[in-house]
């Protein structure tokens, strides 16, 4: 693999810098094992950028991201900056503008129950025993969150509020292709979530998804209403491979998927644009209460690196190597404190060292 790649690294706040350090250890192992030419540059973002530059997303950070093939993002936010106006706080002032600037229209959230962690799953033991490995593909830029008109008007008993669910054909086509392409790298099944028995936007959604499905004859397509999907995720999550969702439905289902895994410290996330450029981050927050204690679980950050390799650098072999290394560590009972349940726990640094070593060894 001879191409040169460049990654913008944005560690951020709280546990972000310490878990990012572990992801970069793993990246070193990937570089060496797969002879990949990958360089990195670090930039301030979030609260760290406010402290150092007076704003959560400095121009130099945006420029650095523009020059990169992908962004590896840590986490932002914390009580130190909560007194600031909302649009100047780390989350709203950094992450949302980055998504908008790079036109990141799709969000990918894997949710997997790892062998040995079934006890953390809040579902019944017989359901958890079947395991699950789901990818929730959510459209990020359309739908009811952004549709117009929206607002409030009137007064007294006639006061009202309104939002508008709007989807264009091109928005549905491109998110559907992301889901089908992802399914080709997984178990070849897409379940599209809608409310086509009631909503016009969902009727269009279903029609277009059916059209796109003809381009992917090797991928099985099923449709499911959102209300049934929320129940089926509790009843038997193992039936799902890729979930294809609108903005609102994906917002709901991706969090439900996260909850049934039992540990936010294990969940990565990817946001992509049409050119394959992506921002990759853990699904959890900055956890300022445990920052600097060397006890945070770095696996979500390391898995975010795996997604980056798979989707932005087209290095699926390297991504799989990371995932296998994590599987082995967990199967051997290696746990950070959030997963230890009274047993011996390893530190953040130790978990990073172990996973990097397993990647290097090619387990």
From Swiss-Prot:
SMART domains: Iso_dh. GO terms for molecular function: 3-isopropylmalate dehydrogenase activity; magnesium ion binding; manganese ion binding; metal ion binding; NAD binding. It catalyses: (2R,3S)-3-isopropylmalate + NAD(+) = 4-methyl-2-oxopentanoate + CO2 + NADH. NAD(+) binds at residues 78-91, 285-297. It is an enzyme of class 1 (oxidoreductase). GO terms for biological process: cellular response to amino acid starvation; L-leucine biosynthetic process. Substrate binds at residues 99, 109, 138, 227. Requires K(+) ions for optimum activity. This is 3-isopropylmalate dehydrogenase. It comes from Escherichia coli (strain K12). The gene is leuB.
């Amino acid at each position: 693999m001879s191409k040169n790649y460049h990654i913008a690294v944005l560690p951020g706040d709280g546990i972000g810098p310490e878990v990012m350090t572990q992801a970069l250890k793993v990246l070193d192992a990937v570089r060496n094992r797969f002879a990949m030419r990958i360089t990195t540059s670090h930039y301030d973002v979030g609260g760290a950028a406010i402290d150092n530059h007076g704003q959560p997303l400095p121009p130099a950070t945006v420029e650095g991201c523009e020059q990169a093939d992908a962004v590896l993002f840590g986490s932002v936010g914390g009580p130190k900056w909560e007194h600031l106006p909302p649009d100047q706080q780390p989350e709203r002032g950094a992450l949302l503008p980055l998504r908008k600037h790079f036109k990141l229209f799709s969000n990918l959230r894997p949710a997997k129950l790892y062998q040995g962690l079934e006890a953390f799953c809040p579902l019944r033991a017989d359901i958890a025993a079947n395991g699950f490995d789901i990818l929730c593909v959510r459209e990020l830029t359309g739908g009811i969150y952004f549709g117009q008109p929206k607002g409030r008007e009137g007064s007294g008993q006639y006061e009202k509020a309104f939002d508008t669910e709007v989807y264009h054909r091109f928005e549905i086509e491109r998110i559907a292709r992301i889901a089908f392409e992802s399914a080709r790298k997984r178990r070849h099944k897409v379940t599209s979530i809608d409310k086509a028995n009631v909503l016009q936007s969902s009727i269009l959604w279903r029609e277009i998804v059916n059209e796109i499905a003809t381009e992917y004859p090797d991928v099985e397509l099923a449709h499911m209403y959102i209300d049934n999907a929320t129940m089926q995720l509790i009843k038997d999550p193992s039936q799902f491979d890729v979930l294809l969702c609108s903005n609102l439905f994906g917002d709901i289902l991706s969090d439900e998927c996260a909850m049934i895994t039992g540990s936010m410290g294990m969940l990565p996330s990817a946001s992509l644009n049409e050119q394959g450029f992506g921002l990759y981050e853990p699904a959890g927050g900055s956890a300022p209460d445990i920052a600097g204690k060397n006890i945070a679980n770095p696996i979500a950050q390391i898995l975010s690196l795996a997604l980056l390799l798979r989707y932005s650098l087209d290095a699926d072999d390297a991504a799989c190597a990371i995932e296998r290394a994590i599987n082995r560590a967990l199967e051997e009972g290696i746990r950070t404190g959030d997963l230890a349940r009274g047993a011996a726990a390893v530190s953040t640094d130790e978990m990073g060292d172990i996973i990097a070593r397993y990647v290097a060894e090619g387990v």
